[in-house]
From Swiss-Prot:
Pathway: Fermentation; pyruvate fermentation to lactate; (S)-lactate from pyruvate: step 1/1. The lineage of its organism: Bacteria, Bacillati, Bacillota, Bacilli, Bacillales. This is L-lactate dehydrogenase 1. Its main location: cytoplasm. The keyword Cytoplasm applies. It is found in: Cytoplasm. Keywords: Allosteric enzyme, Cytoplasm, NAD, Oxidoreductase, Phosphoprotein. NAD(+) binds at V15, D36, R41, Y66, A119, S120, N121, S144. It comes from Listeria innocua serovar 6a (strain ATCC BAA-680 / CLIP 11262). Belongs to the LDH/MDH superfamily. LDH family. Catalyzes the conversion of lactate to pyruvate. Substrate binds at Q83, R89, N121, P122, V123, D124, D149, T150, A151, R152, T227. PANTHER family: L-2-HYDROXYCARBOXYLATE DEHYDROGENASE (NAD(P)(+)) (PTHR43128), L-LACTATE DEHYDROGENASE (PTHR43128:SF16).
Amino acid sequence: MKDHQKIILVGDGAVGSSYAFACVNLSIGQEFGIIDIDKDRTIGDAMDLSHAVPFSTPKKIYSANYSDCHDADLVVVTAGTAQKPGETRLDLVNRNIKIMKGIVDEVMASGFDGIFLIASNPVDILTYATWKFSGLPKERVIGSGTSLDTARFRMSIADYLKVDARNVHGYILGEHGDTQFPAWSHTTVGGLPITEWINEDEQGAMDTIFVSVRDAAYEIINKKGATFYGVAAALARITKAILNNENAILPLSVYLDGHYGMNDIYIGAPAVVNRQGVRHIVEMNLNDKEKEQMKNSADTLKKVLDDAMKQID
């Protein structure tokens, strides 16, 4: 990739605009183009965001067209219909997979040869679809996966134990949705297994923590209509890792090819990411219960994915 860091955002709704604002505040990227079906909104947002630039570092922000994707390092997609109260993320697939195909076709027609970062839900399925539609190498098509779920997980444990969330290490794996699960066998706090921090009679509290993490989006949607700050921050973190060639380990929706006993699926797992995309997938030694949970999550996604792709074929 060139030294000049160029990001194109497709989808200027609540998630997209929050992500753009995060990138400005965190000094991520040097050029930031915004695409949306509502052109006036992108013009207004570009103006508004540019007024925040003097408080950060220099950055060119503008209302973009798909032709501007041709030399982008990263295209971030947050477009799609939103999850409504009572809907699961998987319920969105029929509406959003067609939208995604239209977006990917337009981006690829520009000559784009960078990295796709997908946040639209259901993210695991739409990331797989983007890989298929684009023809890009699997390493350069990435989904936000369980990055937000993992952040919620670490924060909830930290609140319970009254420690800094940055000292909690553990991952939510699987679908970014109802079949996700915590890898308790690899969760540590300050270098010690989580079991060293809790008594046997506190296991119920840990189970409650996970349920609150899994269902957090539903609660937020019921109260304010949508979630956007958390996922925007997660996208900004992933963007920073890619553009700055960090080789950071982040829980993302990545393509499994034999990893965890899975094939031909995008699903949430820790991966090393840099400016080439996914460099390596971290295959954790899960216990038997976690292996079964991973299989269940993958099976659920596969069924929905197969049905969704038939609509396009």
